[in-house]
């Protein structure tokens, strides 16, 4: 039975990869295809929870062929998602955009993060991997009156995000940095690392200079089948810079864990 299930899963993953790649190409020529692309993203998110996979989940997540196919699909899906977000920003910046609808549609996952990390009104938050569509930043401003620093390695995404923030008149509350060193001498209260940030373990050491002893870091990630649409993360127990401050929490979009600076480092 497992052999048949594995073959079916590999076929589904390969099919999704081909569909997303083709729709991504089409959307770059005709923007109406972004709607179809969004539906495929929803399919990716629901794939992880399909009932027929659950009995074989551990085997699938440790099968080299499945892991390889998931990595290939994630690369294609993430590239498409980045362009989809850029398309959404352009739409949101238009005069006819309904920004309130956009904000209210945000997933409840962030509310869990706010509670788990103990975020308070008016605090400073660094968002790593903010992307072209900085939903998290906008919600933190709306809910907590936070000051959010957005950092992303993609200059085009940063520029589009700036345009969106400017169109909303939130330049003071949502600021953009091109280098983490811009936060020197002004540490943040919290850090949120986006699920699509790839090398999370290496990033942690870079973030230490910009936090206080009481800061919390929210690490978003997805392992196993959930890594189809998220980059994986496994906390190293012997990490000298950070320690876990919560158990892993599962949300509809990704998993998350709260880290805090290791005071003994």
UniProtKB/Swiss-Prot annotation:
Cysteines paired by S-S bonds: none
The protein's Enzyme Commission number: 2.5.1.-
Pfam families: NAS
Enzyme class: transferase
Family matches, as InterPro entries: NAD(P)-bd_dom_sf, Nicotian_synth, SAM-dependent_MTases_sf
Reaction catalysed by this enzyme: L-histidine + S-adenosyl-L-methionine = (2S)-2-amino-4-{[(1S)-1-carboxy-2-(1H-imidazol-4-yl)ethyl]amino}butanoate + S-methyl-5'-thioadenosine + H(+)
Family in the record: Belongs to the methyltransferase superfamily. CntL family.
Described function: Catalyzes the nucleophilic attack of one alpha-aminobutanoate moiety from SAM onto L-histidine to produce the intermediate (2S)-2-amino-4-{[(1S)-1-carboxy-2-(1H-imidazol-4-yl)ethyl]amino}butanoate. Functions in the biosynthesis of the metallophore yersinopine, which is involved in metal acquisition and thus enables bacterial growth inside the host, where metal access is limited. Therefore, this enzyme probably contributes to Yersinia virulence.
Name of the protein in its database record: L-histidine 2-aminobutanoyltransferase
Species classification: Bacteria, Pseudomonadati, Pseudomonadota, Gammaproteobacteria, Enterobacterales
